């Protein structure tokens, strides 16, 4: 039997050229589809992540500013105004830090009752924080009611109230004992500023304790152009530049992604931007 | 033989399509799940913010509810005594819990926890708020036992004194400051055996006694009235009790509280802490009996005899007294055209009676400044 002769039932080993070409075409087409799908999904993934990050920045930024400003006290015509300076992209104010009730006062010390009536994210800090103690010599009259600002002259110490319960002893000076009912309201505050600050070439919402040490620290960002916009309104809803007249604050935060995101249409270099606006009602304004 | 060859041929023709497809599906599924996770995180963040806001609103409702439904019983809670109130649902998924702590000088600290509940009733968000409150004591310009915008005429055998005097047998009164006997925008005229004494005895032609000195506290207190009585005659005011165990009967319009204290006879102790604000939009004639608190009369007040009252009397019309046995311990303010105190009455200035009448009868309001507090517990 000649070697070149193939019987009808001889097994067919290998592929024909057409089969190979067909297989390669199918392979390339499938691989291209998979690659395109992966690219698409990767873009979607990155865009979604950037958008989520930008929105989280917006939410946390606006909540931070709103929470800080909501508790601000303001009295039209002056008096007990906690807004010290107001601008379109910064605000300086007394930020409330602790609250509770006194259990003992003397000329140079205020003891704050610890326990469930005391509230604060951190302990008072000397110099940086100040005391606000409610004075009301004549409880039958509101005309002498006032929060008296006193310095904190030493680190607060653990102590006891006259009844033996735990207290926080805060050193101060210039307190006129007869002006206070004990127990009575007490607060602490620090002078704060919120403003735009730059770090690593990016803009952030920064916070700085003006009564403490240290500079402006970025807390939320990155923000886009005009990242923090504040409009101050009086009781009639008109914008005002007088701190004591402010009743509401319109707050706009504009966020920006960390890096450019390729758009689904193929565009390159677009930075995701988003914004959130809300109105903060000053709960202690009158 | 032929079947074996065909099987071998099929094995040889296996391609990469299935493997590639599986790999592609896995990669795509991973990417989709990544996007899904990112979206879930974003949505969870948004939901969290909404729930936190709802919890805050529940806490706000708790603050407002306490002020709207203030009970004068809170005014006498023990100092430092935390008073926790039952939790209240706000809508289908909100809840607040209040704790009220009394301080001195008529001040309170209200703490409220607001919860947002999930479908199974579990807490999914909590916020804490607080508010400093004070008793809504109106600004009362009391510088004398009797304050009148018009002239004061004292006759008969009356005794008006501005020296601070506690009601008989009352205990726990802080020392007060002596005031004038009578203070008037016109003249104070005493006839017969009448006596007007104090520090000073009289303040006459006081131009500061304008309408608002009388109408401002009148209108404020009127809004907190315990008893609103039509104009007319009222006789024999007596403290009464009801129920078992017995308690002061606030539903009885002739029960104006118990000013007497032991060892006086017939003291109704259940009503010693009852200081009603009695308001009449018309004119009143009162005759015999006793009471305490704040008496507000928009018209004229005529006290005819044997009527004892501890607290504050504000009359926007004229005040006239007659007969014997009348006694007011506290302060009287009259804006009307004439004040004629004749017969055999006594009017004693009492800082203690004034303070108790106010502190036991008024509701609370937020401190004027820095009352609202964001708390962490």
Give the label of every model feature segment.
Chain B
Residues 12, 72, 350-351:
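Polar helix-capping/helix-linker motif
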Residues 16-58:
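Aliphatic-rich helix starts adjacent to a transmembrane/signal segment
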Residues 20, 39-40, 44, 64-67, ...:
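Charged, amphipathic alpha-helical interaction segments
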Residues 101-240, 245, 270-377:
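Short, ordered "entry" segments at domain starts
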Residues 246-276:
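Eukaryote-specific, low-hydrophobicity, charge-rich regions
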